[in-house]
UniProtKB/Swiss-Prot annotation:
Signal peptide per UniProt: none
EC number in record: 2.7.1.170
Tagged with keyword Cell inner membrane: no
Keyword Transferase appears in the UniProt entry: yes
Keyword terms: ATP-binding, Carbohydrate metabolism, Kinase, Nucleotide-binding, Transferase
Gene responsible for this protein: anmK
Species annotation: Salmonella gallinarum (strain 287/91 / NCTC 13346)
Gene3D superfamilies, A to Z: 3.30.420.40
Protein's UniProt name: Anhydro-N-acetylmuramic acid kinase
Gene Ontology terms for molecular function: ATP binding; kinase activity; phosphotransferase activity, alcohol group as acceptor
Ligand binding (ATP): G12, T13, S14, L15, D16, G17, V18, D19
Amino acid sequence: MKSGRFIGVMSGTSLDGVDVVLAAIDETMVAQQASLTWPIPVHLKKGILDICQGQPLTLSQLGQLDTQLGRLFAQAVNALLARQRLQPRDIVAIGCHGQTVWHEPTGEAPHTLQIGDNNHIVAHTGITVVGDFRRRDIALGGQGAPLVPAFHHALLGHPTEKRMVLNIGGIANLSLLFPGQAVRGYDTGPGNMLMDAWIWRQCAQPYDKDAAWAKEGQVILPLLQKMLRDPYFAASAPKSTGREYFNYGWLERHLTAFSGADARDVQATLAELTAVSIAQQVLLNGGCERLMVCGGGSRNPLVMARLAALLPGIEVSTTDKAGISGDDMEALAFAWLAWRTLAGLPGNLPSVTGATEASVLGAIYPANPITQS
């Protein structure tokens, strides 16, 4: 069974940077050793957002973006290697999620698309890459997401305590880790995505640091109620979603009847939407003893405070308290999934995604042995 140092690369729906994590992994442990966040240039971020919101583009433009992101991911990996004074031969493999630009797991021809050419990552790092993790699950009738609940269970499952792990990225997803039961998990709806989109359009800021802007506003209850009536929130699991659904266009449609609303009030309402939609799903599943939060949204004090208020009797804390950085959880998960793929072990959970069977995930892009010598 392949063990050693792995690197995980994650660029999520928040588009707040490329997260790169170094970890030692074997069948008994995942030990994080280092991490960094690499910036995404504005022109690449704009290109990704345009695709996700259905803007027309040529195949040439898509191909260029695929190449540019692959090179960017390689730059991020090489920066971490340089910082840690490591060589390509010191790393078993890179697990790269890629950048999701479209996710449509239902319908006549279900599909998902992550870009960031893994061939360029191999060529510019000299390290084997495992990528394209989601499409096998979709081919087996699953949602292709979320994939992190298996990792949450491996790291944070408890023999007696009823736990849930909440990842608040651009989209929020919940993992249900109940003793004696199959792991379940699904996307609850928007996490940071709508909050980030609104403050970007209004203030040209990438995110609302410390929720300072939202704290100046008041929740617009009719707007909140209107947004919560979206059918996604009432849909049964397994389910998954992304920026192709919860995007700025979605927000604009809900704001048509609130054209005179104060921008700060809209931001406060979007923070409340994230907290309420998550809390509803926690309670719908019978609650838990501990809700462990990771992802960028775990650093939003308003969302965290509202979750604690909406979930009395449940301990709401970040995964940092359990010794796992909430900022690095997803990148770490894809390093772990790369290890499982190379070990010939399944990476999906049918109880989470709805796939017909558990399967080894991803495609392997081998490094040139000469490069690694």
